[in-house]
Swiss-Prot record:
HAMAP family: Glu_cys_ligase_2. NCBIfam families: gshA_cyan_rel, PRK13516.1. Keywords: ATP-binding, Ligase, Nucleotide-binding. This is Putative glutamate--cysteine ligase 2. Its EC number is 6.3.2.2. One of its GO terms (molecular function) is glutamate-cysteine ligase activity. GO terms for biological process: modified amino acid biosynthetic process. It catalyses: L-cysteine + L-glutamate + ATP = gamma-L-glutamyl-L-cysteine + ADP + phosphate + H(+). It comes from Bordetella petrii (strain ATCC BAA-461 / DSM 12804 / CCUG 43448).
Length: 415
């Protein structure tokens, strides 16, 4: 059996990746402008931190390694501003959010790299449907065994990350009824899911990878689209379930939450085997209902996810104070519990604007840090922002000759 070397990292270090939307500033549809944007940034100091993604309407922004989330936030703000300047120069805008509200997957162009071209050939339309946008959080760990223990310890909290970050309620012009529809695209791939319950240390992880290779099911760890997975070449555990938030501030708050939670799980016993029993149900509840979903704890108690999250924040606050991140966790807690997640904000924007292209425009403003635009959500009564299966209006911008759509087109009913 081939051994997989694990590069040791300092505990509690962290970094993030953000997959971002490139937006046409006139139609507010996606723009296949990644090549032009990357060329514009080729000589910029952060050029090596901006990467192409599977389709040409996406780019990925990678942080460096940090010990404290405030340092991460300072770097992300600098990179955001540099990215926006370059985007302005090539005539596009940038937005966060887990899915574009009205893009058509058929119009997406695959990026020109051997791996992306292979994925398109292998997975067909799924590769173009994979034009969705996530935040990955990396947490430093000292060894492979520590990485496996961390993955197992964090797994019961996957629903919390999903619900806190959810920002993909709309897809192809329809309110999906989900807070996070992005993960439905991820789950279509055959090696999506989670670490097998019987993988309890690095040796067993290596054995599992060897078995997948022997069966021709995977060539490398990159083929594992798990919710949380080890990243041995970085020396990290990678949390992969978060939608890309609408702002870098929320992205860094989530990183601070992950850092404190990682400390907590190293101090507590490993979750009971029953933790895996409700894994898929908890995952669905968080995607579908966000913070209002139900949650089954590892010991079998059923309660609202938001109530479990409140109790979790109480347990995390002493750790956050040790790490010097209390302010960031308080901000995440208060904003999420009082105003809801980004999915609710997007629905409140549509409630106010009645036009999906204008919602996308508000997403681009939020990404730039124009908080006066993003703050309007709190003014809309919660009871008036319920999800609906009715088709979304205000997508006339799609009905253009360029898009190949008949004028007057409306999205089909969801059901």
């Amino acid at each position: 059996m081939e051994q997989i070397p694990f590069v040791s990292s300092a505990p509690n270090t962290l970094g993030i990746e953000l997959e971002l939307q490139l937006i046409n500033p006139r139609s507010f549809d996606l723009a296949a402008a990644a090549d032009e944007l990357l060329a514009q940034m080729a000589n910029h100091p952060i050029a090596d931190r901006v990467k192409p993604e599977i389709t040409r309407s996406m780019i990925e922004l990678n942080s460096s390694v940090h010990e404290h989330p405030m340092g991460l936030l300072a770097e992300m703000r600098e990179m955001r501003d540099a990215l926006c300047d370059a985007a302005d120069a090539v005539g596009v805008s940038v937005a966060g959010g887990g899915a574009h509200p009205f893009m058509r997957w058929q119009e997406r162009a695959i990026s020109d790299s051997p791996r992306f071209q292979y994925l398109a050939e292998m997975y067909g339309y799924l590769a173009r449907q994979f034009t969705v946008f996530g935040q990955h959080i990396h947490l430093g760990v000292p060894s492979g065994d520590a990485a496996v223990r961390m993955v197992r310890g964090l797994s019961p909290y996957v629903p919390h990350f999903i619900a806190l970050s959810a920002s993909s309620p709309y897809y192809e012009g329809v309110d999906t009824l989900f807070s996070c529809c992005r993960l439905n695209a991820v789950s279509s791939f055959p090696l999506a899911g989670h670490l097998p319950a019987d993988v309890t240390d690095w040796y067993r992880f290596e054995a599992h990878i060897a078995q997948l290779r022997a069966c021709g099911l995977a060539e490398s760890i990159k083929d594992l689209y798990w919710d949380i997975r080890p990243k041995p070449e970085f020396g990290t555990v990678e949390i992969r379930v978060c939608d890309t938030p609408l702002t870098v501030e929320r992205a860094c708050q989530l990183a601070a939450f992950a850092q404190a939670l990682a400390v907590l799980v190293t101090r507590e016993p490993e979750p009971a085997p029953a933790a895996w029993l409700a894994y898929r149900s908890n995952h669905f509840q968080a995607c579908r209902f966000g913070l209002q979903g139900s949650y089954v704890t590892p010991d079998g108690q059923r309660l609202r996810l938001i109530d479990h999250l409140r109790a979790l924040f109480q347990r995390l606050m002493p750790i956050a104070d040790e790490l010097g991140t209390g302010d960031m966790l308080v901000a995440l807690r208060d904003e999420s519990i009082r105003n809801g997640n980004d999915a609710r904000w997007l629905r409140s924007q549509f409630h106010r604007l009645r036009d999906l292209p204008l919602v996308v425009e508000s997403m681009t403003h939020a990404w730039r840090g124009e908080r006066e635009t993003a703050g309007a959500a709190a003014e809309v009564p919660r009871r008036r922002i319920r999800a609906t299966s009715e088709p979304v209006h205000g997508v006339q911008a799609l009905a253009t000759p360029e898009a190949g759509v008949t004028p007057g087109w409306r999205p089909d009913r969801l059901h």
